[in-house]
Structures are given as C-alpha cells and as structure tokens.
A protein has these predicted regions:
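Acidic, two-metal ion nucleic-acid-processing modules in DNA metabolism proteins
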Residues: 1-115
Length: 115
C-alpha cells in the first residue's frame, strides 16, 4: 500500500531537510532588491533577483537595528542569513541577518530607462 502524507507532514519534512543543510545555515546571496515592503511590525519583506531567478526574503525587526541604510527597490545588495522553510505555507525564503549595500542594480536601471 502507498504511504500517504499530509501537507503538514511534507512541509515539516522539507523544513528538516533545509535545517540539516550546513550551506543554507549561513549563506550570503548577491542580488537586486525588488518588492521591498516595510511592515508596521518592523519586519522588512523583499525579494532578491538577478537575471536567472528570484528569492523571497525577510529581515525581522530584531535584526533590522543593524541595517545602516534605508533599503529600496533597485538596490544591489549582499544579504547574509539562513535559507529555511516557512512551514505553514511550504515556502522557502532567506531569513536576513545582515544586508550590505553595493549600489544601484543594473536590472532596475534598465527598467527605469524603459519608462
């Protein structure tokens, strides 16, 4: 007989796989900021993108105190943190602990040139 799993069981299993991966525990990712939203709770929700992909990210209010600039769409940044699964939604994302500004992103500049 086939083993049938609940959605929650699958999400928990996938989360455990992420937790066990030592590369994802402390990773730095370079990209351009997109869809940057400052939540009333103090959290920052944003995406990192490049020519080949998109990665959902969040910086919780407690880590935001160390942010030395006001992040916005189009910023080219390096984000340090942990990639993990938000178990309820089954979505993986980068939980940012550190964000370093590198300047304006080329993708955003090309977008502005088209306007």
């Amino acid at each position: 007989m086939k083993t049938i799993y609940s959605v929650g069981q699958v999400n928990r299993y996938v989360k455990n796989m992420f937790v066990q991966d030592f590369v994802l525990k402390k990773i730095y990712v370079k990209g351009e900021v997109s869809n940057c939203k400052y939540h009333p709770s103090g959290h920052i929700y944003f995406s990192l993108k490049d020519e080949t992909g998109l990665l959902s990210c969040v910086m919780f209010a407690g880590h935001r105190r160390g942010l030395a600039f006001s992040m916005k769409d189009g910023d080219k940044v390096v984000v340090g943190g942990t990639v993990d699964v938000y178990e309820r939604d089954g979505r993986y994302q980068l939980y940012a602990r550190e964000i370093i500004l590198e300047g304006a992103g080329a993708l955003y500049e090309r977008f502005l040139a088209l306007k």
